[in-house]
Amino acid sequence: MNSYSSSLFRAKALIFILIMFNTLKIQAFDIDRFDQSNAFALGRDLVAMPFGMNLLEVNNANADELVIGIHGGISEGYEWIYPLWQLNNEFNQVFFYRWNDKRCANANNANLVNQIDTLLDNYSDVKKIKILSHSYGGTHLLYSLDLIEQRIANRNQDLKIEIHFIASLLSPPLLLRLGCQFKTDFKDDYSMNIYNWKTIQEIDGAFRNYRKDPQEISISSASQTRLPESYNGRKLGHNWSISWVADEIKESN
Protein backbone atom coordinates (compact mmCIF):
# COMPACT_ATOMS: atom_id res chain seq x y z
CA MET A 1 0.00 0.00 0.00
CA ASN A 2 2.81 2.39 0.91
CA SER A 3 4.64 1.47 -2.28
CA TYR A 4 1.48 2.12 -4.31
CA SER A 5 0.94 5.50 -2.60
CA SER A 6 4.54 6.44 -3.21
CA SER A 7 4.30 5.55 -6.91
CA LEU A 8 1.05 7.46 -7.23
CA PHE A 9 2.60 10.50 -5.60
CA ARG A 10 5.59 10.38 -7.96
CA ALA A 11 3.29 10.05 -10.97
CA LYS A 12 1.23 13.05 -9.86
CA ALA A 13 4.39 15.05 -9.21
CA LEU A 14 5.69 14.21 -12.68
CA ILE A 15 2.42 15.30 -14.30
CA PHE A 16 2.51 18.55 -12.31
CA ILE A 17 6.09 19.24 -13.42
CA LEU A 18 5.22 18.57 -17.07
CA ILE A 19 2.22 20.90 -16.87
CA MET A 20 4.34 23.62 -15.28
CA PHE A 21 7.06 23.15 -17.92
CA ASN A 22 4.57 23.46 -20.75
CA THR A 23 2.99 26.51 -19.12
CA LEU A 24 6.39 28.17 -18.82
CA LYS A 25 7.13 27.43 -22.47
CA ILE A 26 3.81 28.96 -23.52
CA GLN A 27 4.53 32.04 -21.43
CA ALA A 28 8.01 32.30 -22.98
CA PHE A 29 6.43 32.64 -26.39
CA ASP A 30 3.68 35.03 -25.40
CA ILE A 31 4.61 38.06 -27.49
CA ASP A 32 3.35 40.41 -24.78
CA ARG A 33 5.85 38.94 -22.32
CA PHE A 34 8.90 39.35 -24.52
CA ASP A 35 11.72 40.97 -22.55
CA GLN A 36 13.92 43.00 -24.87
CA SER A 37 16.87 42.72 -22.48
CA ASN A 38 16.77 38.93 -22.79
CA ALA A 39 16.55 38.71 -26.57
CA PHE A 40 19.34 36.15 -27.01
CA ALA A 41 17.83 33.63 -24.59
CA LEU A 42 14.37 34.15 -26.05
CA GLY A 43 15.82 33.80 -29.54
CA ARG A 44 17.23 30.38 -28.67
CA ASP A 45 13.80 29.30 -27.47
CA LEU A 46 12.19 30.70 -30.60
CA VAL A 47 14.33 28.70 -33.05
CA ALA A 48 13.91 25.58 -30.90
CA MET A 49 10.19 25.56 -31.62
CA PRO A 50 8.88 22.75 -33.84
CA PHE A 51 8.77 23.03 -37.61
CA GLY A 52 5.59 24.67 -38.84
CA MET A 53 3.45 27.64 -37.83
CA ASN A 54 3.86 28.63 -34.16
CA LEU A 55 1.46 31.05 -32.48
CA LEU A 56 3.36 33.45 -30.22
CA GLU A 57 0.52 34.77 -28.08
CA VAL A 58 -2.84 33.91 -26.57
CA ASN A 59 -5.26 32.82 -29.26
CA ASN A 60 -7.72 35.45 -30.52
CA ALA A 61 -10.23 33.84 -32.88
CA ASN A 62 -11.55 37.28 -33.88
CA ALA A 63 -8.23 38.63 -35.17
CA ASP A 64 -8.50 40.48 -38.48
CA GLU A 65 -4.78 40.35 -39.35
CA LEU A 66 -2.07 37.70 -39.34
CA VAL A 67 1.65 38.49 -39.02
CA ILE A 68 4.06 35.70 -39.98
CA GLY A 69 7.84 35.74 -39.56
CA ILE A 70 10.03 33.37 -41.61
CA HIS A 71 13.60 32.97 -40.33
CA GLY A 72 16.79 32.70 -42.33
CA GLY A 73 19.45 30.00 -42.37
CA ILE A 74 21.08 29.03 -39.08
CA SER A 75 19.07 31.74 -37.33
CA GLU A 76 19.76 32.41 -33.65
CA GLY A 77 16.28 33.87 -33.25
CA TYR A 78 17.24 37.01 -31.33
CA GLU A 79 16.91 39.16 -34.46
CA TRP A 80 13.15 38.45 -34.45
CA ILE A 81 12.32 39.31 -30.84
CA TYR A 82 11.89 43.07 -31.13
CA PRO A 83 10.27 43.05 -34.61
CA LEU A 84 7.57 40.55 -33.66
CA TRP A 85 6.85 42.42 -30.44
CA GLN A 86 6.73 45.73 -32.33
CA LEU A 87 4.23 44.46 -34.90
CA ASN A 88 1.89 42.87 -32.38
CA ASN A 89 -1.39 44.58 -31.50
CA GLU A 90 -4.76 43.68 -30.03
CA PHE A 91 -6.32 43.01 -33.44
CA ASN A 92 -3.75 40.62 -34.93
CA GLN A 93 -2.12 37.27 -34.31
CA VAL A 94 1.64 36.84 -34.58
CA PHE A 95 3.23 33.61 -35.80
CA PHE A 96 6.76 32.31 -36.28
CA TYR A 97 7.20 29.85 -39.14
CA ARG A 98 9.94 27.30 -38.57
CA TRP A 99 11.22 25.49 -41.63
CA ASN A 100 14.13 23.22 -42.43
CA ASP A 101 16.71 25.74 -43.63
CA LYS A 102 19.24 22.96 -44.20
CA ARG A 103 17.32 22.00 -47.33
CA CYS A 104 17.01 23.85 -50.62
CA ALA A 105 14.67 26.81 -50.23
CA ASN A 106 12.49 25.62 -53.11
CA ALA A 107 11.71 22.34 -51.33
CA ASN A 108 8.51 21.72 -49.38
CA ASN A 109 7.06 25.15 -50.15
CA ALA A 110 3.59 23.60 -50.19
CA ASN A 111 3.85 23.11 -46.44
CA LEU A 112 4.04 26.87 -45.85
CA VAL A 113 1.08 27.45 -48.15
CA ASN A 114 -0.97 24.68 -46.53
CA GLN A 115 -0.35 26.15 -43.09
CA ILE A 116 -1.41 29.62 -44.25
CA ASP A 117 -4.54 27.99 -45.66
CA THR A 118 -5.24 26.38 -42.28
CA LEU A 119 -4.82 29.72 -40.51
CA LEU A 120 -7.42 31.26 -42.80
CA ASP A 121 -9.79 28.41 -41.97
CA ASN A 122 -9.29 29.06 -38.26
CA TYR A 123 -9.43 32.87 -38.40
CA SER A 124 -12.50 33.66 -40.45
CA ASP A 125 -12.36 37.43 -39.81
CA VAL A 126 -8.90 37.92 -41.29
CA LYS A 127 -8.65 40.64 -43.95
CA LYS A 128 -4.88 41.06 -44.12
CA ILE A 129 -1.75 38.93 -43.92
CA LYS A 130 1.77 40.29 -43.49
CA ILE A 131 4.57 37.84 -44.21
CA LEU A 132 8.07 38.95 -43.22
CA SER A 133 11.04 36.91 -44.40
CA HIS A 134 14.73 37.35 -43.68
CA SER A 135 17.90 36.18 -45.41
CA TYR A 136 17.53 32.57 -46.67
CA GLY A 137 13.95 32.65 -45.40
CA GLY A 138 13.32 35.19 -48.15
CA THR A 139 14.49 32.62 -50.68
CA HIS A 140 11.98 30.14 -49.27
CA LEU A 141 9.19 32.71 -49.46
CA LEU A 142 10.21 33.76 -52.97
CA TYR A 143 9.72 30.22 -54.26
CA SER A 144 6.37 30.05 -52.47
CA LEU A 145 4.87 33.17 -54.09
CA ASP A 146 3.11 31.44 -56.98
CA LEU A 147 1.60 28.83 -54.68
CA ILE A 148 0.42 31.47 -52.19
CA GLU A 149 -1.18 33.54 -54.94
CA GLN A 150 -2.94 30.51 -56.41
CA ARG A 151 -4.22 29.34 -53.03
CA ILE A 152 -5.53 32.78 -52.08
CA ALA A 153 -7.28 33.08 -55.45
CA ASN A 154 -8.92 29.68 -54.93
CA ARG A 155 -10.35 30.82 -51.61
CA ASN A 156 -12.23 33.68 -53.30
CA GLN A 157 -11.74 35.90 -50.24
CA ASP A 158 -11.15 39.63 -50.07
CA LEU A 159 -7.64 39.44 -48.62
CA LYS A 160 -4.78 41.91 -48.69
CA ILE A 161 -1.41 40.15 -48.71
CA GLU A 162 1.86 41.94 -47.92
CA ILE A 163 5.12 40.19 -48.74
CA HIS A 164 8.23 41.63 -47.09
CA PHE A 165 11.68 40.45 -48.18
CA ILE A 166 14.20 41.77 -45.64
CA ALA A 167 17.93 41.48 -46.38
CA SER A 168 16.93 38.42 -48.38
CA LEU A 169 18.89 36.14 -50.67
CA LEU A 170 16.79 36.68 -53.79
CA SER A 171 19.49 36.24 -56.44
CA PRO A 172 21.52 33.28 -55.14
CA PRO A 173 25.02 32.63 -56.49
CA LEU A 174 25.44 30.28 -59.45
CA LEU A 175 26.53 27.19 -57.51
CA LEU A 176 23.50 27.41 -55.21
CA ARG A 177 21.19 28.04 -58.16
CA LEU A 178 22.51 24.98 -59.96
CA GLY A 179 22.61 22.75 -56.89
CA CYS A 180 19.02 23.52 -55.94
CA GLN A 181 17.76 24.08 -59.49
CA PHE A 182 16.52 27.56 -58.58
CA LYS A 183 14.59 29.25 -61.35
CA THR A 184 15.40 32.87 -62.16
CA ASP A 185 12.30 33.89 -64.11
CA PHE A 186 9.47 35.33 -62.03
CA LYS A 187 6.31 37.11 -63.00
CA ASP A 188 6.53 40.87 -63.37
CA ASP A 189 3.37 41.42 -61.39
CA TYR A 190 1.57 39.68 -58.53
CA SER A 191 -1.78 40.32 -56.89
CA MET A 192 0.10 40.68 -53.60
CA ASN A 193 1.95 43.80 -52.42
CA ILE A 194 5.64 42.96 -52.48
CA TYR A 195 8.29 44.96 -50.62
CA ASN A 196 12.01 44.37 -50.97
CA TRP A 197 14.02 45.90 -48.12
CA LYS A 198 17.73 45.82 -48.96
CA THR A 199 20.67 46.51 -46.70
CA ILE A 200 23.77 48.30 -47.97
CA GLN A 201 25.72 45.32 -49.27
CA GLU A 202 29.14 46.57 -48.13
CA ILE A 203 28.09 46.66 -44.45
CA ASP A 204 25.93 43.53 -44.49
CA GLY A 205 28.00 40.76 -42.90
CA ALA A 206 26.14 38.05 -44.80
CA PHE A 207 26.34 39.62 -48.26
CA ARG A 208 29.39 41.91 -48.38
CA ASN A 209 31.64 39.30 -50.01
CA TYR A 210 29.23 38.53 -52.84
CA ARG A 211 30.36 39.75 -56.25
CA LYS A 212 26.86 41.06 -56.98
CA ASP A 213 24.19 42.20 -54.55
CA PRO A 214 22.10 39.03 -53.94
CA GLN A 215 19.15 41.10 -52.71
CA GLU A 216 18.11 42.16 -56.20
CA ILE A 217 14.92 40.69 -57.63
CA SER A 218 13.43 40.60 -61.12
CA ILE A 219 9.82 41.25 -60.05
CA SER A 220 9.24 44.70 -61.53
CA SER A 221 6.14 45.45 -59.43
CA ALA A 222 8.03 45.01 -56.15
CA SER A 223 8.70 48.13 -54.08
CA GLN A 224 12.46 48.55 -53.58
CA THR A 225 13.90 50.27 -50.50
CA ARG A 226 17.57 50.59 -49.58
CA LEU A 227 18.09 50.75 -45.82
CA PRO A 228 20.29 53.47 -44.26
CA GLU A 229 23.76 52.92 -42.80
CA SER A 230 22.75 53.08 -39.15
CA TYR A 231 19.85 52.33 -36.82
CA ASN A 232 19.58 53.63 -33.25
CA GLY A 233 23.29 54.42 -33.23
CA ARG A 234 24.32 51.00 -34.56
CA LYS A 235 25.54 49.85 -37.94
CA LEU A 236 22.46 48.66 -39.81
CA GLY A 237 23.70 45.26 -40.89
CA HIS A 238 22.09 41.95 -41.69
CA ASN A 239 20.22 41.11 -38.49
CA TRP A 240 19.20 44.60 -37.34
CA SER A 241 17.43 45.04 -40.68
CA ILE A 242 14.28 43.28 -39.43
CA SER A 243 13.93 45.71 -36.53
CA TRP A 244 14.31 48.73 -38.82
CA VAL A 245 11.66 47.39 -41.20
CA ALA A 246 9.30 46.56 -38.34
CA ASP A 247 9.51 50.18 -37.19
CA GLU A 248 8.74 51.36 -40.72
CA ILE A 249 5.75 49.05 -41.06
CA LYS A 250 4.42 50.05 -37.65
CA GLU A 251 4.75 53.75 -38.47
CA SER A 252 3.01 53.39 -41.84
CA ASN A 253 -0.05 51.60 -40.41
Predicted regions mapped to residue ranges:
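Active-site catalytic motif of lipid deacylating hydrolases and related acyltransferases
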Residues: 28-127
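C-terminal catalytic-base region of ester-bond hydrolases, centering on the histidine
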Residues: 183-253
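Serine-dependent carboxylesterase/thioesterase catalytic core
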Residues: 99-102, 106-204
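Short, aromatic/basic amphipathic alpha-helical patches
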Residues: 81-89, 148-151, 178-185, 207-219
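Cleavable N-terminal signal peptides
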Residues: 15-16, 26
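Bacterial N-terminal signal peptides that target proteins for export
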Residues: 3-13
